[in-house]
Amino acid sequence: MNKIALYCRPGFEKECAAEITDKAGQKEIYGFARVKDNSGYVLFECYQHEDADRLIREIPFRELIFARQMLVVGELLRDLSPEDRISPIIGMLQGVMERAGELRVEVPDTNESKELLKFCRKFTVPLRNAMRQEKILLIRENANRPVIHVFFIAPGCCYVGYSYSNNNSPFYMGIPRLKFPSDAPSRSTLKLEEAFHVFIPYDEWEERLASGLYAVDLGACPGGWTYQLVKRSMMVHAVDNGPMSESLMDTGQVKHHKVDGFKFVPSTKNIYWLVCDMVEKPAKVTQLMADWLVNGWCREAIFNLKLPMKKRYEEVAHNLQKMHLQLKENGINAQIQAKHLYHDREEITVHVRRIWSAYAANRDDY
């Protein structure tokens, strides 16, 4: 198996390919990307057979922006017989994988694959049983063992491979399944909820998404992102010249500042979260976020960067590198992650965590 399959949003295959080619080159691993527009996935074929496994071990999945999932695969299995689809799939894995912890039978995230997804759900049970009989898969799921992926790109055609559970997306098809809350002011609320799922480990939610924390939402109107903060019992400074949702204001947890988000300066030093979803040039938003972090006005930030029409990966990489250098020059130790989330469209979501000593929020300062 000398290929890497990367799932992505349809229409962003070129960005995904540019990114994996860049990351592989940094590891001195070389190959070429196979891209089909609007397919929802990219293949990166390594020149050296063992390099594919090395890549999915050494490239931190959390550092990939445009990939929803990353796995090693073999050659495409074509024209699987309806009488026996299982044997060829088992054959691809024998001698390659044993005692895996989970099976995922998946498809690209395209409209054309919706019917195929129904088949995958039915096919999973007999395939899982067969893999357990062959000792390719453990009897019980184990989150510490590799994941087997069977990736159908068309009826009877699939890639078979694996990912490592400590360096992959834990979500089926790389997509968190979130339900839109009926009382939220806008669908944008799902972007921030997904960002919490992707960027913050569940075992740290009680500390980092705790009730009583203070937050600022720049460009808050009508309140889609503020809603997520209020739902977690935070106190929110909502900054926007436009109107906020009355239901959010009625909670008593929101203070509305009718100010331009680029001009707002917090009057207290107890802000933990800064969130921002403003339609502006990526460089301008990146600079604003860097200023907040350098000034120590927040501890963590989640913000969106709108993507240009061309050279999206290059533009994103440039802005993130610029932020990294600015923080470093100011002696700020920070973790930076970025992801093209499922609920993002022509934008990416960035998370920055400033590493400094913890402090207790003081309600009297609100």
From Swiss-Prot:
GO BP term, example: rRNA processing
Record field: catalytic activity: cytidine(2498) in 23S rRNA + S-adenosyl-L-methionine = 2'-O-methylcytidine(2498) in 23S rRNA + S-adenosyl-L-homocysteine + H(+)
Disulfide-bond pairs as recorded: none
EC numbers for this chain: 2.1.1.186
UniProt GO MF annotations: S-adenosylmethionine-dependent methyltransferase activity
Coiled-coil intervals, chain numbering: none
Enzyme class: transferase
Keywords, comma-separated and alphabetical: Cytoplasm, Methyltransferase, rRNA processing, S-adenosyl-L-methionine, Transferase
Subcellular compartments: Cytoplasm
Assembly description: Monomer.
Function: Catalyzes the 2'-O-methylation at nucleotide C2498 in 23S rRNA.
Family indicated by similarity: Belongs to the class I-like SAM-binding methyltransferase superfamily. RNA methyltransferase RlmE family. RlmM subfamily.
Protein name: Ribosomal RNA large subunit methyltransferase M
Organism: Photorhabdus sp. (strain Az29)
